[in-house]
Design a protein with these regions (language model features):
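N-terminal glycine-rich phosphate-binding loop for ADP-containing cofactors
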Residues: 1-420
């Protein structure tokens, strides 16, 4: 899709994600129309867009002039037929209710032109949950964005056409983003399927008294080179969002350990959210803003990090990365590409495994405990054993998941490489 070449882009849902995606489209030169069934929500769209643009400008991602110009290309519309008229692409970001989404997509198909691409930005529902609600599945797919990052997961359904995938990849390229076409659908896509377990491991370290918030974040920042740790990230995402994501998970009495973890996390987060500590936007979360402790020049040197926290977080991160690859959702290099695009870090989990050494990683997994379920643990173990059997134990021997001394992830073209 080209700016001004295939009509405007229609965004269904005037919440944060709808506004963020509309802003990205407008910044790339597209005309964007935001539709919402609630007039009150639509009236708040300009303010939401302005706040998001302001944060991007402060971060140095866009200029104030670009933000101002983009805002002029974003319109609001209460009438669905009018919003869809002339649209080349539709992106849905309404609340996560399957029945409502299915009804919406049936309606979108009735009113949109026959060549309009219909996409969902759902974070928790799968393509297979929704795609049969439309008659023409060739033009339906998931196009999943990440707030604050230029990573876009593209997930085709069984009927999605190659032409639709190509147009979506072109669209992401015009946005200046990185597209990751998943081989098959996966709960949490790729990045979220890794970051979720990392955040859970971080909270459990503090809940169980193994480390402090600062020790956990310091360990992660030293391991990954990230400018913030898991608790800083939760402040960035918003603590209410994290709390709601755990609250909306169904109870799992058949899995007592997972159910216990859910209850522990909710009890930990409840007083944070209950006292209005919503994160960066509210000025206070796990840290106080605009000058959080982790941003201090001496944060990494002032105190030692927790090695136990380092082991727990690294294990959760890398084991889930391996599981994504072994489940044939995405290749190891594409898993790393997703991580690097989303976090702006220099290395992804498979590069870190090479750095640790695959033999040592196996020991680490044994010490910290495997992923839930023997089947998953077996998959992770087999993947690393197979690599070791080929003499690919990591950086120290010059080959692991990458070839050294010039690993693919260090190339300037890595993020724009093949994603299929």
């Amino acid at each position: 899709m080209r700016p001004h070449g295939e009509g405007h882009v229609c965004f269904i849902g005037g919440g944060t994600m709808g506004c963020y995606n509309a802003l990205l489209a407008a910044l790339a030169g597209y005309d964007a129309v935001v539709y919402d069934i609630a007039w009150d929500s639509l009236l708040e769209v300009p303010q939401r867009v302005s706040e998001i643009a302001g944060e991007m400008a402060i971060a140095g991602l866009i200029s104030p002039k670009a933000a101002q110009d983009a805002s002029l290309r974003i319109a609001i519309q209460k009438d669905l037929k009018a919003a869809l008229y002339g649209a080349g692409l539709v992106s849905e970001s309404i609340f996560e209710n399957l029945a409502v989404k299915r009804e919406l997509f049936a309606e979108l198909e009735r009113y949109a032109a026959s060549d309009t691409i219909l996409t969902t930005n759902s974070s928790s529902l799968l393509v297979s949950d929704i795609e049969d609600a439309v008659i023409d599945g060739s033009r339906f797919a998931a196009l999943h964005s990440h707030l604050g990052a230029m990573l876009f997961d593209i997930v085709p359904g069984p009927r999605t056409s190659p032409a639709t995938l190509s147009r979506l990849q072109d669209y992401v390229q015009h946005l200046g983003g990185v597209s990751l076409v998943l081989k098959k659908e996966n709960k949490g896509y790729v990045f979220n399927a890794m970051i979720g377990p990392v955040l859970a491991a971080a909270m459990l370290q503090v809940i169980d008294g193994a480390a402090s918030i600062e020790e956990v974040d310091r360990a992660w920042m030293k391991r990954t080179g990230s400018p913030m740790g898991p608790f800083g990230m939760m402040d960035l995402f918003g603590t209410r969002l994290i709390y709601d994501s755990w609250k909306n998970r169904p109870a799992m009495p058949e899995q007592p350990l997972m159910d216990l973890m859910r209850r522990k996390v909710l009890s930990f987060l409840a007083p944070v959210v209950g006292t209005g500590r919503f994160g960066m936007r509210s000025g206070r979360g796990f840290y106080t803003y605009p000058a959080p402790a982790y941003a201090a020049p001496d944060f990494l040197q002032a105190h030692p990090e927790s090695s136990l926290a380092d082991y727990a977080l690294t294990s959760a991160w890398t084991q889930n990365a391996v599981l994504i690859a072994t489940n044939d959702v995405a290749r190891p290099h594409d898993v790393d590409r997703a991580w690097i695009a989303a976090t702006r870090q220099a290395k992804g989990p498979f590069a870190i495994l090479d750095e640790i050494g695959l033999d040592r990683a196996l020991t680490l997994f044994h010490v910290t405990g495997p992923l839930a379920g023997p089947e998953n643990a077996g998959k992770v173990h087999k993947c690393l054993i197979d690599q070791l059997a080929q003499g690919r134990s990591g950086l120290q021997v010059g080959k692991g998941f990458y070839e050294y001394p010039d690993p693919a992830y260090a190339a300037v073209t890595f993020l724009s490489g093949s994603v299929i």
